[in-house]
Amino acid sequence: MRRIITFILIVAFVSQSHGWGATGHRVTGMIATNHLNKKAKKRIEALLGQESLAMASTWMDDIRSDSTYNYASDFHWVTVESGQTYDQSKKNPNGDVIMTIERLITELKSGKLDRTSEIRNLKFLVHLVGDIHQPLHVGCCDDQGGNKVQVKWFGGNSNLHRVWDSDIIEGTKLSYTELAQSLGAPDEATIKRLQSGNVRDWANEAMTYRTQVYETGNGNLGYNYSYKNLPLIRERLLAAGVRLAGVLNDIYGK
């Protein structure tokens, strides 16, 4: 019984600490798949086999209990103080989401990775492009990306990071396929606009939402907070998927 309780506590901690929840990440993976060109799709399928990008998107969270990957624990996030740029910010010697995405893209483009390393890097990339579009993964303070900001969510205990990772999304009662489909198909102009920037542009964009994210009033969150922020979450998921497709087409589709 003690082992079961310990396992439940570990799962609860992991689920509220890193990335969009499974639904959000899988939405991003599904949208990306829908925007891959034929060559990129074929090459990615050759690497992942029957595993879709949607399913591969959560692998980086799934392996958190494997100590082999402890080195990757800081890859999910970055801290950039308000008023600073990433270049001006203090860097984490263990890495962060920005430098890791940039490194993964460079390594995947090089064509020098063995198959196992390429698959690992691909799965890392799919996950982290999702992470950087969750505004609290580009943190500004010492609150661990909102994990230390305790709030009530429809009367239950939660924290701001968890609200953005999964609480609002779970409130839609939609599967990842239903949520992805509900976002619609962006037109060519929107795709071009979303894919025109780079990783640091994405981080700068995430920083612009800080005021909105932290407007929690007395901390009793529910319908009003969800109503105000669900449209932004939907936009973030769509942008992440389209941009991920752009990166993958650049790596595998030329």
Language-model features: locations:
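Sec-dependent N-terminal signal peptides
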Residues: 4-13
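N-terminal, motif-rich segments that launch catalysis or mediate targeting to/interaction with membranes
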Residues: 18-128, 135, 141-254
